[in-house]
Amino acid sequence: MKIELFLVVIFALAIHMATAEEVIESDIEPAERGCIKSGQRCGSPHGLPSNCCDDWKYKGRCGCTMGVCTCGKNCPSRGCDYRTKG
């Protein structure tokens, strides 16, 4: 009886840990929930998508440049999602 109870507890803990890892992974990649805001990390160096929001403030380099989102009103649409303002 004790062995069966022990196995049930171990099985329940294994399920709990598996679901906890999924929650942690979903918090690591906020980019999947929408576009990435200007100044935040993006692109393959960080294992993230390159869909940057346009926050209408930055006037220099545009899109996902050197692993950071930089978008603004003077930027071409390269890598920036102009449908969603940051």
From Swiss-Prot:
List-wise, which residues carry Lysine amide? Answer: K85
| Cystine connections | C35-C53, C42-C62, C52-C71, C64-C69
Tissues where the protein occurs: Expressed by the venom gland.
In the UniProt record, does the keyword Metal-binding occur?
Answer: no
UniProt GO MF annotations? sodium channel regulator activity; toxin activity
Q: Where is the signal peptide?
A: 1-20
Compartment(s) of residence: Secreted
Q: Which UniProt keywords apply?
A: Amidation, Disulfide bond, Ion channel impairing toxin, Knottin, Neurotoxin, Secreted, Signal, Toxin, Voltage-gated sodium channel impairing toxin
List GO terms (cellular component aspect): extracellular region
Keyword presence, Flavoprotein = no
Which positions are cleaved off as the propeptide during maturation?
21-33
What is this protein's function per UniProt? Answer: Toxin active against S.frugiperda larvae. May act on sodium channels (Nav).
Q: Give the UniProt family note.
A: Belongs to the neurotoxin 39 family.
Q: What is known of its domains?
A: The presence of a 'disulfide through disulfide knot' structurally defines this protein as a knottin.
Protein name (Swiss-Prot/TrEMBL): U2-sicaritoxin-Li1b
Q: Could you tell me which species this protein originates from? A: Loxosceles intermedia
